[in-house]
Every structure is written in structure tokens, then in C-alpha cells.
Amino acid sequence: MQKIKISPSILAADFSNLGLEIKKLKKAGADLIHVDVMDGHFVPNLTIGPPIIKSLRKYTRIPFDVHLMISPVHKYIKSYADAGADIITIHPEATNNLKKSVKLI
């Protein structure tokens, strides 16, 4: 039987203390850490940018599952990958060239 992987989101975490929140997820046995990225355009809220992803790396090697809810998504894929995203999820409607965006991932 295949092991189910747990990927808790940090969206409801205390953003003023993300390092501690990441440590809690590590201690709890999270397999991945889900990071919702919102740009205030594609979706109405604003959240985490690449510098935050990069700074969180010092707290864990748990893979970051980064969900990009931003548009145009292709402009930012490389920045998030370079910052430490291990898995990147995009919305097809967030790009005018899905093939190009997938290739960037």
C-alpha cells in the first residue's frame, strides 16, 4: 500500500513567526509544506514572495509544495524555483501559454 503524504498549508500560520511554524510542522512529521502564493490580482489576497521561500529554507529541508495563484504565472516560476520550491502548481487560466509555463517548471 502506498503511503499517503501530508502537505499542511502555512496559509493560516503566524506570518510573524514562520520559522517556528515550520519547525512545528517538521516535528509533527509533515512530508511536504504547502505554500499558497497569491498576488492580489489572480486572487484577491496577497501572501508570500520568493524571498520568504528562500529564508524558510534555513529551517527545514522538507520539500516546499508551492501553489502559484498569480498571473501571469510564467513570469514568476523561475523565481520561486530558484528560491527553493520543490513542487510548483499553477492554474492553466493564469497563463496565455500553458505549454511554456509547464516547460519552465
Name each region found by the language model.
Residues M1-T89, E93-K100, L104:
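Conserved N-terminal beta1-alpha1 strand-loop-helix module at the mouth
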